[in-house]
Amino acid sequence: MVKFDSGSESEMTNGDELHINSKHEVKSRMANGNGVHNVPDHDQFQDRAEMEVLILPDLFSSLMSVPARENPHYASVKADADEWISFVINADAKWASRNKRVDFTYLASIWAPDCSAFALRTSADWNSWAFLFDDQFDEGHLSNDLEGAINEIARTREIMEGTAPRYTADSEHPIRYVFQTLCDRVKQNPEGFYAGKPSSERFYRRWMWAHELYWEGLVAQVRTNVEGRSFTRGPEEYLAMRRGSLGAYPALVNNEWAYGIDLPEEVADHPLVFEIMIIMSDQILLVKDILSYEKDLRLGVDHNMVRLLKAKGLSTQQAINEVGVMINNCYRRYYRALSELPCFGEEADRALLGYLEVEKNHALGSLLWSYNTGRYFKSKEDGARVRKTRELLIPKKMAAL
């Protein structure tokens, strides 16, 4: 069992948006699709004649063709992590059950198969925080409230900078409390509190920088919503916004911490190292946009490349094919950047190789998690069917949107 002390000296909600009121109670209503598939109407379309059959690109090619490994601490960490987040947000039994199926610990387990139990628990809790935090901006109360979005980010930034008040588990702001515990943990060694040398100031600055990129993307996303520009943007503008708001940047740096990777400044600041981070973020979000297409249609989520290309005049299949081309181009961009990287020396290059492994595991884990947890499908079995056949079935009445 993994225990921690917060130092008391923050695509999950299953289609339900969480509402956390001043009494620290979680309420939910059908609103967005960051969790497992749970729509009774979906089963009404069993007749293939009523479905549009979309052929997906091979999403397990190139860097994604390698076998994944699972962290040996997965089972014990999952039990503790699921129980803790449900307690912190005072979730009801229905939410807690769904959260177990979403399985953020599995995602973290593929991301960092060799990290300690403490680091895996921190990564799983970061995933819980990120999805709860993000839901407020996606389809929640901040999705069209630019001032409110900027204010919530400012309060969260204060936590990261150490200028915020200490929150508690029974706080009126449980998402902020979760994030505060994460900041406490990431300042420590990934083996555990006081288990070894704590994180360097250099690394914590990088961790903060990655979160700032995420928050800049969220603000840009809300501004786009307010201006009603979701479908008037070009693909490049969409990618520029989504690679930030996706949250991949801080997740990647969090995984660096889990492995004890502290990139020297000459490596971390090299433009090609950042370019590789951009490339893998693009790959993750483009894969997500294909797999989540039906769910985004159902829930009215506009931030989807397939939907954007359809608004430009492409058919659904043409749009999916085009996104497949973009994904393959990510791999070309990756190998091109890799070939142009200089040698930094033995110690720095060792850290760089660890960083590259983290990047690959992050993309692979996100892909497998989408299929294996039924995140975007009726069930794990439906996800397995889509992976095997590469056929995505969309009700025709929905495909016309």
From Swiss-Prot:
Keywords: Magnesium, Metal-binding. Pfam families: Terpene_syn_C_2. Substrate binds at residues 242, 295, 375-376. GO terms for biological process: isoprenoid biosynthetic process. GO terms for molecular function: metal ion binding; terpene synthase activity. Mg(2+) 2 binds at residue 139. The Asp-Asp-Xaa-Xaa-Asp (DDXXD) motif is important for the catalytic activity, presumably through binding to Mg(2+). This is Inactive (1R,4R,5S)-(-)-guaia-6,10(14)-diene synthase.
